[in-house]
From Swiss-Prot:
Name the record gives this protein: Light-independent protochlorophyllide reductase iron-sulfur ATP-binding protein
UniProt-annotated binding residues for ATP: G10, I11, G12, K13, S14, T15, K39, N180, R181
Keywords assigned: 4Fe-4S, ATP-binding, Chlorophyll biosynthesis, Chloroplast, Iron, Iron-sulfur, Magnesium, Metal-binding, Nucleotide-binding, Oxidoreductase, Photosynthesis, Plastid
GO cellular component terms attached to this protein's record: chloroplast
Organism: Staurastrum punctulatum (Green alga)
Alphabetized GO MF terms: 4 iron, 4 sulfur cluster binding; ATP binding; metal ion binding; oxidoreductase activity, acting on iron-sulfur proteins as donors; oxidoreductase activity, acting on the CH-CH group of donors, iron-sulfur protein as acceptor
Top-level lineage group: Eukaryota
Binding positions for [4Fe-4S] cluster per the UniProt entry: C95, C129
UniProt keyword annotation of Plastid present: yes
Protein localization: Plastid, Chloroplast
Upper classification of the organism: Eukaryota, Viridiplantae, Streptophyta, Zygnematophyceae, Zygnematophycidae
Gene name tied to this protein: chlL
Biological function: Component of the dark-operative protochlorophyllide reductase (DPOR) that uses Mg-ATP and reduced ferredoxin to reduce ring D of protochlorophyllide (Pchlide) to form chlorophyllide a (Chlide). This reaction is light-independent. The L component serves as a unique electron donor to the NB-component of the complex, and binds Mg-ATP.
C-alpha cells in the first residue's frame, strides 16, 4: 500500500506522517517513509537527525545507480520505520517531481520499492503542480492534513481537485482528512458536507504534538518516558487502523473556489444570535505546527 500525505504548508504533515508511520509499524507492518521536500526534514522525528538525501547520494556517485547500495540511502528510524529523503533541486531551479521520480527509480533499482507493506510519501506544502503531484502517480491513497482554519481547508480543496484529476488515469482514492491540533471542527464539518469525504481523525489542541517536533521525537517515543502521552498515540493508532482496513476511499469532487469562499466565510459571518457574543467562536482557528 502506498500513501501520499498532503496539506497546507506548516500544518504539521511531517509530524503527523511520522506518527502514522510508527502506528502502522506497531500494527506489524514494514513501513518506509519517503520525505519529498527540499528541506529534507520529513523523517527528522524518526531518525533524530537530517539524513542525506537521494539526490546528494546520486550526485556523490555521479549518478551511477549501480554504485549505490540500500544502506547509502535508507536509514533505520525509531520503531523500525525505514526512512528516505528525496531532497530537491537547487532553489529556483529544477523540478521536484523529477526528484521524486529519481527516488522511486533508484528504490526500484535497489529492489526496495516493493519490499514494504506500506510506503508513505510526505509531500511538501500544498503545491499541487504537475511536479509535486508526482507522488500521486504512485499512491493508492491520499491523506490530507488540515485544521479548522479557512486557509487550510482552501488548500485541502485544491489537493482534492488534484486527486480527482489523477484518479482519471490512476487507481487513486482519497482516504480522508486528518484534522491536526485544532480546538474546533465546525468548519471541517461544514466543508465535508459540501465536498463529501471521510474524516479519519481530528487531533485536539495538544501542545506536546508541537513540542515533539522540536525535540526530534515522535509521540510514541515520548510516551516511553511519559506514559501520560499514550492517549495521544491512540489517535494515530486509530488512523492506522482505518488505513489498514483498506476502505474504498473516495474520488472527491472539489467545491468551486468562489463557492467555497462564500461557504466558509458565511459560516463565520452569519453565526446564530446565541453565539454572536462569544468572540472565541467567531475567530478562525489558524493554529499550526
Amino acid at each position: 500500500m502506498k500513501i501520499a500525505v498532503y496539506g497546507k504548508g506548516g500544518i504539521g504533515k511531517s509530524t503527523t506522517s511520522c506518527n502514522i508511520s510508527i502506528a502502522l509499524a506497531r500494527r506489524g507492518k514494514r513501513v518506509l517513509q519517503i520525505g519529498c521536500d527540499p528541506k529534507h526534514d520529513s523523517t527528522f522525528t524518526l531518525t533524530g537527525f537530517l539524513i542525506p538525501t537521494i539526490i546528494d547520494t546520486l550526485q556523490s556517485k555521479d549518478y551511477h545507480y549501480e554504485d549505490v547500495w540500500p544502506e547509502d540511502v535508507i536509514y533505520k528510524g525509531y520503531g523500525g520505520v525505514d526512512c528516505v529523503e528525496a531532497g530537491g533541486p537547487p532553489a529556483g531551479a529544477g523540478c521536484g517531481g523529477y526528484v521524486v521520480g529519481e527516488t522511486v527509480k533508484l528504490l526500484k533499482e535497489l529492489n526496495a520499492f516493493y519490499e514494504y507493506d506500506v510506503i508513505l510519501f510526505d509531500v511538501l506544502g500544498d503545491v499541487v503542480c504537475g511536479g509535486f503531484a508526482a507522488p500521486l502517480n504512485y499512491a493508492d491513497y491520499c491523506i490530507i492534513i488540515t485544521d479548522n482554519g479557512f486557509d487550510a481547508l482552501f488548500a485541502a480543496n485544491r489537493i482534492a481537485a488534484s486527486v480527482r484529476e489523477k484518479a482519471r488515469t490512476h487507481p487513486l482514492r482519497l482516504a480522508g482528512l486528518v484534522g491536526n491540533r485544532t480546538s474546533k471542527r465546525d468548519l471541517i464539518d461544514k466543508y465535508v458536507e459540501a465536498c463529501p469525504m471521510p474524516v479519519l481523525e481530528v487531533l485536539p489542541l495538544i501542545e506536546d504534538i508541537r513540542v515533539s517536533r522540536v525535540k526530534g521525537k515522535t509521540l510514541f517515543e515520548m510516551a516511553e518516558s511519559d506514559p501520560s502521552q499514550n492517549y495521544v498515540c491512540d489517535f494515530y493508532l486509530n488512523i492506522a487502523d482505518q488505513i489498514l482496513s483498506k476502505s474504498e476511499g473516495v474520488v472527491p469532487r472539489e467545491v468551486p473556489d468562489r463557492e467555497l469562499f462564500s461557504l466558509l466565510s458565511d459560516f463565520y459571518l452569519n453565526q446564530p444570535s446565541s453565539s454572536t457574543n462569544n468572540s472565541e467562536t467567531n475567530n478562525l482557528d489558524f493554529l499550526m505546527v
